[in-house]
């Protein structure tokens, strides 16, 4: 989750990822009943991880782990603060653990992960799926009058410190 939209605030430049123990979550499993959805679950997450992205609109749209590159990909909508470049894609090292440190503006100490790279790649907010071997299905959203749609394309991740995507 995140606090976003208010460009006057200085404490809304992080996304917050809640971490839960997958094994512990099993005791809350229930069959889906659309007429009476359950709301069971743990009282608290195991951890809150703050991810510095700068201000974004609507927070994280897609978070995907790519086992081939061992990176997390985070797709967001551009933010509105002029102090940030507001890239739509962030990369995080999947092998680095978050570290406790003071977050900007408030000085409060939290678990924090910093991005290892960014990309100006403008798709992925409405869908991204790692397929392995550097291949991804990535959504291109659009609108035709009142109808919204998404086309899915196959992409290859480029190599390097700050990878990008090439359509296959």
How would you name each of these model-derived features?
Residues 10-33, 85-105, 149-167:
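Beta-propeller blade signature
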Residues 49-118, 126:
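Loop/turn-rich, solvent-exposed surfaces of beta-rich toroidal or solenoidal domains
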Residues 125-168:
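Blade-level signature of beta-propeller repeat domains, shared across WD40, Kelch, NHL, RCC1
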Residues 1-4, 64-66, 129:
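Hydrophobic, aliphatic-enriched repeat segments that assemble into extended interaction scaffolds
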Residues 1-60:
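Eukaryote-skewed repeat-based solenoidal scaffolds used as protein-protein interaction platforms
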Residues 1, 69-74, 134-138:
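Entry beta-strands of beta-propeller and related beta-repeat scaffolds
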Residues 3-7, 77-80, 141-144:
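Residue-level signature of beta-propeller blades and closely related beta-rich strand-turn architectures
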